[in-house]
A protein has these predicted regions:
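Phosphate-end processing signature that detects enzymes handling 5′-triphosphorylated RNA
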Residues: 2-268
Length: 268
């Protein structure tokens, strides 16, 4: 049974920093209809961890090379995601144990537009991610909206096998290179809440950057990230959020990640 969103309490995100908003105003906009032309559903993703101060530097260097997604005049957007897993956290455990082939099932709401999607993400042993999704009314209407049809085709589970585990909220900036061959998503003010333990945690000063592209096409931002000494680093919002908010889970695989994050935040 899926619980009501109204019962899943989570602290609201801070407003995006004023200086970040001012920097975003210097980028040419790209509209949502134009963004929909850039479909990277079969893609290679690479994540990077940075701080707000490093993000400010990156946005200065990226001017003239990227456009920023703009929706209803806003150049950053609010997201709310609920991750589903089996009662014994099978998908979390698969990731924790180092399996390259893994899967995530989530319900994501774009808070500024109100659109909600049931999504299945599959990663293969070559690091390529395939995402399939369908529009739904809410987490309460997954059965009526045909969620099992999507899961039967693309997941190892059906809705009856899954329960809500972890939710998060964050604010996302989306940049697109001038050639429209890649997306760069920049997530700020990431907050977690566990649906069972009711524990909250947050990475307010951490920035999660993800480069999304098909294959190994040229990426203008890679040299900029190297210049700022922003290095690739895995970061699963579901797994990190779970490890932070559920003390009963194994977390050995993620201990080094937490040490790295602490060091990064302390040095900036």
């Amino acid at each position: 049974m899926f619980v009501s969103l109204h019962t899943l309490r989570i602290v609201c995100s801070n407003a995006m920093e004023k200086h970040i908003v001012e920097l975003l105003d210097k980028f040419p906009p790209i509209s949502l209809p134009e963004m929909k032309e850039i479909k990277l559903m079969n893609r290679i993703d690479k994540k990077y961890l940075a701080t707000i101060s490093q993000l400010e530097q990156l946005l200065v260097l990226a001017q003239g090379k990227y456009m920023v997604q703009q929706i209803d005049g806003k150049r950053y957007n609010r997201y709310h995601t609920i991750y589903l897993d089996t009662p014994d956290e099978e998908m979390y455990t698969t990731h924790h144990n180092g399996r390259l082939v893994r899967q995530k099932v989530r319900v994501r709401t774009y808070l500024d537009s109100g659109d909600t999607f049931l999504e299945v993400k599959n990663k293969n042993n070559h690091g390529r991610t395939k995402k399939k999704r369908m529009s739904v009314g809410s987490i309460q209407t997954l059965y009526e909206d045909g969620g099992d049809i999507l899961l039967a085709k693309h997941a190892n589970y059906l809705l009856a096998d899954l329960v809500p585990k972890v939710e998060n909220r964050f604010e996302r900036i989306t940049l697109v290179n001038m050639g429209k061959t890649e997306r760069l998503t920049i997530d700020c003010h990431v907050k977690f809440h566990h649906c069972e333990t009711d524990i909250h945690d947050t990475f307010d000063r951490l920035v999660v950057i993800e480069l999304k592209r098909d294959g190994n096409v040229y990426s203008p931002v890679k040299s900029l990230l190297r210049e700022l000494r922003i290095k690739p680093s895995g970061f699963s919002k579901y797994c990190i959020g779970s490890a932070l908010t559920n003390p009963m889970l194994k977390r050995n695989r993620f201990k080094s990640r937490f040490v790295k994050i602490k060091k990064l935040l302390n040095n900036h």
